[in-house]
Amino acid sequence: MITMEQIKRELANIRYYYSRKDTFAKAFDSVGQNGILGTVTRYNQIICMAPPRVYEVYVCLYIECCTYEAAAERLGYSVSYIYKSNKKIVDFFYEAMNQEVA
């Protein structure tokens, strides 16, 4: 069973990975693949099953590394909507991952 805190930590790591994706790609040839890629793949597979608005906000926050303010402006939502959507993202992953275990 995965906790909400674990999901939040993994999402932070995913965001970090995407913010430095080129560095990770360059290091792959000389060092090898970092373990974060397995986490990224797992989360990306799960988010594909999310409702469209949850998916859209996930991409903006975690793949494109936007702040809440930048995501709100880019997507045409309020900052509070993005904040609430991020909670829905965490809840979505929590439910999906804990159903896998059950």
Give the location of each predicted region.
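Generic hydrophobic/packing signal
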Residues: R42-I46, Y58, Y81, I89
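Secondary-structure boundary/capping signal
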Residues: V54-Y58, V79, V101
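C-terminal flanking helix
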Residues: V90-N98
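N-terminal interaction/assembly modules
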Residues: M1-M49, E69-A70, M97-A102
